[in-house]
Amino acid sequence: MASGTFVSRGLGLVRNVLLVAAIGTTGLVADAFDVANKIPNVLFAILAGGVLNAVLVPQIVRAYRARNTQERLDKLLTLSGVILLALSALLTAGSSILVALYTGPGWTAPQTSLAVAFAFWCTPQLFFYGLYTLLGQVLNARGQFGPFMWAPVLNNVVSIAGFAAFIALYGPAVTGNVDDLTQWDGTKIALLAGTATLGVAAQALILVVPLWRAGFRWHLRFGLHGIGLRSAGQVALWTFAAVILEQVGVLFTTRFASEAPRAALAQTFGAYRDDPGTLGAVTGLVTGAPDAFSGALAVAGNAAYTQALMIYLLPHSLVTVSIATALFTGMSAAAHAGDLARVRHDLSRGVRTVGVFTVFATAVLVVLALPVTKLLVPSVDAASGEAVSMVLRAMALGLVPLGGMVLMKWVYYAFEDGRTVFWIQVPGTLVLVGVSWLGTQLLPPQLWVVGIGLAMSLSNLVAVGLRTVGLRRTLHGLDGARILRLHVKAGLAALVSAVAGWGVLRAFVVLSGDPADGIYGLSWWQSVVVVAVAGTVMGLVYAGGLKLMRVRELDQLAGPIVGRVRRLVRR
């Protein structure tokens, strides 16, 4: 699973590089597309993602233990598919309303219209994300985890081809006219946004192949009787409410982030919203003198936030999601059987193994934020790279609690306990929105999105703390001493490795001969060298520290990788 995720994320980075090359990371079009492409992801999380994970997996596990397995699966998949299709059609028709929810009053009419056009093409992704989850969970319940993790590879291949075609036809963002909104006709919009949706469709439909080969046939079968939804109704409602609450936080932070560039520009250049013409002063500055104003225009907004979030989630998706997916089906079965010891053991093992990786990943992202940003987003300029990297550092502080938070949430789902998930989400959302809003009041607009990143980290910490308290009661203990001891040891090793990585960065600044510019002016190739050298040094120091402190979880995490490398060498 991790190897599939690794390849997928690698191609995802290539996809992202081409997207940034096409429309940039800051500016009118970048923010408009980011809002539109975020909508189906948010909608899926609200309307399907959480409910499907909370309800579908336990019911599929039960279906495979029942005598009428095929009938139950057919009814579950048919009901879910019909609901997804109807919601997708309805929400696509309401694209303009959705865009209005996620944008602030500072958006001009032309930019809002462009975002609505993008959203009309992007919102149907909701159906295909749902279909991907439905088919993938059937495969997972059968013990076939690989296809679910490899399917996004096809998504990225399709997107890479489409974005490359866009650049070939219309040129890259660096030509300086990407934010000329009068140039965005229907064909140009369809190629960019339609490519994103086509990739998600391919990701979902490819899962039909492994299911067919495994002998599974899905027949349309309507009906609610005998599929366990009566027992799942409560958890579905509570989970739905929890996800709604979570996405309220996303709604507010998106609006805060969308206003940051305009607030910074108004602060620097004065009022511009009522300027005559279709482009406005912001576009005039970008197209007329992009070099002169690049520093002032490179204020982190929605697009920069998304770039930082993409990098931040790489270690999470590579390790945490893979481990959680592998453990969830077994934990659901153990919870159904009342085997608390098995659930407690699996959760402890998952949190400790994930912690070994996320503690180190936090150190790397904090120390190497700027070179990592320039490595993974090669087309970003110096000012935009600095804006993204500052947000990334703030987010990275919440990476460790994020891993534990996700694993613990899935334990609640295994017990079909949506009520507790909801009530724990309340203070988490309040912290996220409250601290983000406080940042807009106390910080300059250039740092609003950094404040959102810090708020997100603090929210993760609050959520994992509350879930720990709740699960300690549910499982009659959490193996807390071992978990805490592991994280303390990993934290000490990561601190030493961070100092070593910082030393490598300082050495590079001295050797570069330009202390004034230093890391800020790194080229892509220099970023490759810095990340490779500093990352290797940090990794060796970290692994050495864990070995000295006899942290066995390192072997559990690295064992499969080492074993595969050895087999390849022997061949």
Listing of model-derived features with the role each one plays in the protein:
Residues M1-R571:
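Membrane-embedded alpha-helical bundles of multi-pass transporters/translocases
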